[in-house]
């Protein structure tokens, strides 16, 4: 999708007597799902979804396909369901790998590992080969040891690993130290898809259909919520120990991605948790929910005469960058004691990056 269609996020730190006293999050992301999809056949809608979104394109296409099939009352065969889940997981793995091999190293003034990232991407067409390549890279590049062993580490063993291992992720975690996490948030976590009841999904779908503004500022049980790997991995013992000791901040989000990445070869081998679900809501209405690298993606469609009449998309970025959500709460706590403008802006950028928006963002400092 072009930049004009994607929009962007503007985070404004408003100073009162040289101290950040207010945080404003404004999104210029246009809600174009209705305009782009209305009047299309289900097949054309799925094709368009895969083309217009530059990030998570496979997940977006799958979401459109699944939502339209649900509206038509079509039940996909087991082979198609497995193929879709594998494509979503492969795309998710590549996004996580990009963070650890390219994005965060550049921010931390470390040397990026583009060669490993390209090797992983070259194997993406074959789930078996991708799983084998990812397992090898986890051992040689990401962790420095077998993923099965690394995943058993408690917090003390993890701290020893990040201090001693020569891998790029270990070096990145060294910068966190052993103190409190950066940008701690207490915002509720959106339950992972595997824990969402059909009635809860149906409620989200009906809210989106009834009010298009809900798609831009979604709420869970009456308030904002955070979604992503941290919500899916919150019960893992290592992540839970980190959060108990250091808080749920940028470091916890990064750790959740690494834990999820380390588990992905096993998931691709067949031990898959729910990453794609379909819901027929009656009256030619269908909903899909898909776990992407950034969090839960929801598509809702109402068909009339075999074509799209209403279409809604609730993307992870809208959850995490809600004007009163996880970002604002995290920044409020993180920069409360940071008087220098530069320190506050740097902190804000790091927290924003940890929440991983699917569009560009800018942090600005202004006076009240």
Locate predicted features.
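Active-site bordering "gate/hinge" segments
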Residues: 1-294, 317-368
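Short, acidic, Ser/Thr-enriched surface-loop or helix-capping motifs
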Residues: 303
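Mixed-charge (Asp/Glu-Lys/Arg
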Residues: 306
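Acidic, carboxylate-rich catalytic segments that either coordinate divalent cations
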Residues: 311-312
